[in-house]
């Protein structure tokens, strides 16, 4: 396998900028692509991204508005939101060399197609080799170089290992797997479940209710993950349980914050993207196609769509028939 030294990150938001820093700390040659030319020029000149205030950009990172720069990269990381990833990959595709690893880092399912991010890569750039990076990680923590562990999955184990070595450092610890689908299910489902956890906190239902909701939500994640071919150890690992714990317990999570606002009866934050809000209907369509019951996720989707009040959703969940745990 050829050396994987040149890395291009597509998307200069908080997460993309943090991942560019990860690659730079791993000793790679890094290019950060910004769709907006003015933003690229500003970040390049000031070495500061307003999305990550107070965290200077590594001097070795080249910031560009030229998408063709990705064509000379050994690895491309897609840091666009899940619902915009196809557009980013389609724009990138003509500039990619055949066989280039393209790592998705968004956690979601494409609305309307029910495609996971690696499937979007396969369709939009069929000559690329898809991989997925996911796990308990906030952009601010990663950008500051705080200790973080994630999962990196590719169907080819040798490639997954090579990608881990290309991005890993003392502060950023990827674990490799070939269970691509398990990793993707964990990342997508936990965002929806985090909204439910936030609602519990916003409604002040107590720590016991939060623990119960998180645990039962994890059961839903595992059921769907296994039905889609994911492995139990992946779902119970960093990209499943680990990410669920983080996202259901920290206000840094946009999905958790959305749930808190909903539970309090406050307007939803308009300046923060919640992947879970977009993923919820696609997740339920996927579950229905595999005859998997997901009552917590279903409640979230109904609340977001205005089909059910929060009090009605809580009542529905608390009056379900008693059953064995599992």
Curated annotation (Swiss-Prot):
InterPro entries: 6-PGluconate_DH-like_C_sf, 6PGD_dom2, G3P_DH_NAD-dep, G3P_DH_NAD-dep_C, G3P_DH_NAD-dep_N, NAD(P)-bd_dom_sf. GO terms for biological process: carbohydrate metabolic process; glycerol-3-phosphate biosynthetic process; glycerol-3-phosphate catabolic process; glycerophospholipid metabolic process; phospholipid biosynthetic process. Sn-glycerol 3-phosphate binds at residues 107, 135, 137, 190, 243, 253-255. Keywords: Cytoplasm, Lipid biosynthesis, Lipid metabolism, NAD, NADP, Nucleotide-binding, Oxidoreductase, Phospholipid biosynthesis, Phospholipid metabolism. NADPH binds at residues 15, 35, 107, 139, 254, 273, 275. GO terms for molecular function: glycerol-3-phosphate dehydrogenase [NAD(P)+] activity; NAD binding. Catalyzes the reduction of the glycolytic intermediate dihydroxyacetone phosphate (DHAP) to sn-glycerol 3-phosphate (G3P), the key precursor for phospholipid synthesis. This is Glycerol-3-phosphate dehydrogenase [NAD(P)+]. The gene is gpsA.
């Amino acid at each position: 396998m050829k050396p994987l030294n040149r890395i291009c990150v597509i998307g200069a938001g908080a997460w993309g900028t943090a991942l560019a820093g990860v690659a730079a700390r791993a000793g790679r040659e890094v290019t950060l692509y910004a769709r907006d030319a003015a933003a690229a020029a500003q970040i390049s000149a000031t070495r500061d991204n307003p999305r990550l205030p107070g965290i200077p950009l590594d001097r070795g990172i080249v910031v560009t508005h030229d998408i063709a720069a990705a064509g000379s990269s050994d690895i491309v990381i897609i840091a666009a939101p899940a619902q915009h990833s196809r557009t980013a990959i389609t724009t990138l595709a003509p500039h990619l060399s055949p066989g280039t690893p393209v790592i998705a880092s968004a956690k979601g399912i494409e609305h309307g197609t029910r495609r996971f991010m690696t499937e979007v890569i396969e369709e939009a750039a069929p000559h690329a080799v898809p991989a997925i990076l996911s796990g308990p990680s906030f952009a601010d923590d990663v950008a500051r170089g705080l200790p973080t562990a994630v999962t990196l999955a590719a169907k080819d184990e040798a490639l997954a290992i090579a990608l881990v070595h290309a991005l890993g450092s003392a502060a950023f610890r990827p674990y490799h797997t070939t269970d691509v689908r398990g990793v993707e299910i964990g990342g997508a489902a936990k965002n929806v479940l985090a909204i439910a956890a936030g609602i519990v906190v916003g409604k002040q239902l107590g720590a016991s209710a939060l623990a119960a909701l998180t645990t039962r939500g994890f059961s839903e994640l595992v059921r769907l993950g296994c039905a889609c071919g994911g492995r139990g150890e992946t779902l119970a690992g960093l990209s499943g349980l680990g990410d669920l714990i983080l996202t259901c317990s920290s206000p840094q999570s946009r999905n958790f914050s959305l749930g808190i606002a909903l539970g309090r009866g406050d307007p939803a934050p308009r300046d923060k993207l919640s992947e879970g809000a977009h993923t919820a209907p696609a997740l339920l369509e996927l579950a229905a196609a595999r005859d998997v019951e997901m009552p917590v996720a279903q409640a979230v989707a109904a609340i977001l769509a205005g089909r059910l009040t929060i009090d009605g959703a809580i009542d529905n969940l608390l009056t379900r028939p008693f059953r064995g745990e599992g």
